């Protein structure tokens, strides 16, 4: 077994410095050395990681795979999905405890709604993959998730715990359509002997997304003990997540539109 120790160390150091930089930013000015210093280290080490991975015979993942648009867009989408899903577990406890004065077990029930929605629809999506393309299912899932988080962001000031639960459930339903089709799309872009490695990479990217969005969320809601500031920070965090979901949606939308255009052009002939 060949372990890419140098690649792992460079990746760990780069992500670690990025997270430290984002976390420090929530406490200090951008001009503080702990913010820009760690960010510069992140850029250098991540650049070295890319150079090393392209050079070594046993990389963590073959970076040439990212030349395939289907693969790279699906990997970016799982990064965003991992991060935005983490918001559903981070923000509600702050809001529900500070604003609505809910107890821990009640907050726990609200947080369960998103995973519940994912479980309810993931099995259905798994069966639909055989008759509907992965891109369509991912698009449906992303649109549903964008709708849920946009409503959470725009209506955060007037939402009650039940409405928050329903919107998180809606997000989970979208996630249930997205996740199985995303896994299938990623696996479909590589050969069978690469699927184990790519599956591990998908999970790694998802976890990096969780860590990244957790650090970013702290920028929005840190030092927000005041109710109005907490609601404002939470609203911005939901909308930021919704915007990144929209960015993840764009490549799939373009591909669907191109496919529809060529179909219509072919039919007209």
Residue ranges of model-derived segments:
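Short, highly charged, low-complexity non-transmembrane loops/tails of multi-pass membrane proteins
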Residues: 265-269
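Short acidic/polar alpha-helix capping motifs at helix-coil junctions
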Residues: 1, 27-29, 57-60
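Phenylalanine-glycine-rich, low-complexity intrinsically disordered regions
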Residues: 12-35, 50-51
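Structural signal for alpha-helical transmembrane segments and their membrane-water exit/capping regions
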Residues: 24, 45-57, 220-226
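Alpha-helical transmembrane segments
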Residues: 16-19, 47, 90, 247
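Short, positively charged
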Residues: 4
């Amino acid at each position: 077994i060949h372990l890419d120790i140098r690649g792992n160390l460079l990746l760990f150091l780069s992500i670690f410095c990025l997270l430290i930089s984002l976390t420090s930013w929530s406490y200090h000015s951008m001009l503080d050395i702990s913010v820009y210093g760690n960010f510069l280290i992140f850029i250098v080490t991540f650049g070295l990681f890319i150079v090393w991975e392209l050079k070594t015979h046993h990389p963590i993942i073959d970076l040439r795979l990212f030349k395939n648009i289907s693969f790279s867009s699906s990997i970016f989408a799982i990064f965003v999905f991992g991060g935005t899903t983490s918001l559903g577990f981070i923000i509600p406890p702050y809001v529900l405890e500070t604003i609505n004065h809910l107890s821990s077990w009640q907050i726990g029930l609200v947080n369960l709604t998103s995973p519940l929605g994912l479980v309810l629809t993931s099995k259905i999506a798994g069966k639909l993959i055989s008759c509907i393309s992965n891109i369509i299912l991912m698009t449906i899932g992303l649109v549903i998730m964008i709708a849920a988080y946009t409503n959470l962001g725009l209506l955060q000031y007037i939402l009650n715990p039940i409405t928050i639960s329903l919107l998180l459930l809606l997000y989970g339903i979208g996630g249930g359509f997205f996740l199985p089709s995303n896994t299938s799309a990623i696996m479909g872009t590589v050969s069978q002997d690469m699927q184990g490695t790519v599956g591990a990479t998908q999970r790694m990217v998802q976890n990096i997304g969780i860590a990244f969005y957790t650090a970013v969320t702290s920028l929005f809601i840190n030092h927000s003990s005041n109710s109005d500031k907490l609601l404002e920070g939470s609203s911005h965090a939901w909308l930021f997540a919704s915007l990144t979901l929209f960015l993840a949606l764009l490549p799939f939308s373009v591909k669907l539109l191109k496919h529809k255009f060529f179909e219509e052009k072919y039919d007209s002939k």
